[in-house]
Amino acid sequence: MKKTSLFVAEIALSHEGSIGNACALMDLAKNNNIDIVKFQDHWARYESSKDELFRVPIGFDKTRYEYWERTEFDQTEWSYIYDYAKKININIGFSIFSPQSFFRQKKLGNHIWKLGSGELLNNELIDILIKELNKKDTVIISTGLCEYSYALNIAEKFSSSVKEVFILDCISEYPCNYADYSFKTWLDQSSKLKKISYGLSDHSGEIWPTIFSWSYGCKMNEFHITFDKKMFGPDQKSSLDPSDLKNLNSAREAFNIISRNEKKKISSLKKNMINFFGRSIGLKNSLPKGHILRREDLLMRKPNGGFSFKDLENIIGKKLKIDLNYKEILKSEHFEK
């Protein structure tokens, strides 16, 4: 279990266009020790058209253009969100979907960028990022709609020019089913990478894929968050709610404690337990004064504190100087000198 694995809470558009909700979701992430909160900057005017439809209709906005437009923030609102992230001391990042949304967030000082799997087909945006990003920037890439080799090729274009690159295994279904994961095969490939870190972007709405990924040493684990899975919006069922986040945080804290010590240490309590459950040489039956001890007279009795098993050969042949009850453990004063 790797303590260095980053947890990314994808707020996306679960805020439904409300700055209050956006800040409250950041609080939810912060209170559960999330490392990075991530938003999506869908700027309808520069990204979409009236012909862009939902894969699964949500019953309120007829087109994605309407949805993006209804939930988007302007520059002033994004600036407020940035300031709030600084106030609560949590890192913030963005999925960007157009050159305009990139330059808007760059102007505000963002340095954590995600290219969703759909944007790996957006050559215009990729070319701009390659030119504009530097060693202050982190790039996150999802495989989702693309073959691993294609996503890796894009990731390698950034590896020499930015601070760090992550490539995340992703299934672009909301929610996705456990049976659809091919994570172990993907992990075997990604573990060979040198300049690119690997991880999981999960849409299951459960904590188990993240725990599985983390246990295999993945460097980044991303998941959507929400106040309630019954809330309106296309991502809510695929998100972790406050109860999920609490359980995930508890697991993370427990695993960190468990994995912290490389060498087992025996505490004073454990030493007392060893004494309690240890054994000493005793008698099978009560024996009279003057009896010379034989092997068949002896056995090991609890607790520890008398002669140990390694002393057995030295005890054989000793002569008792008193009558001795079998309930006693043998001590030096029981023998004639």
For the regions a language model picked out, list residue spans one by one.
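Catalytic cores and adjacent flexible loops of soluble metabolic enzymes
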Residues: 1-337
